[in-house]
Amino acid sequence: MMGRLRVRDVLNEIKWSGKYRASDVEVYFVSRGYRNDVEKVLFTDILELRRGSIIIRRNHEEKYIPHHRILRIAKISGETIWSK
């Protein structure tokens, strides 16, 4: 799935296609203050896919992540599905 696909398209494919198990997919994004300023969440922690962002659940709170901050989407095994 690598290439010039938009992150939104990749997120929707993971959610709807059945090609991937959401519990086996991690999303890496820029998050100031985290180690190397990168945080990751399981795809199952995504509460909502929006046009230009995702909403995640983190420590019992919702967090807004714009698409431009997403750096990489990968399987837990390390295989990259999409990267910036």
Protein language model regions, located:
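Short, compact, well-ordered microdomains
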Residues: 52-84
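N-terminal recruitment modules of adaptor/scaffold proteins
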Residues: 2-61
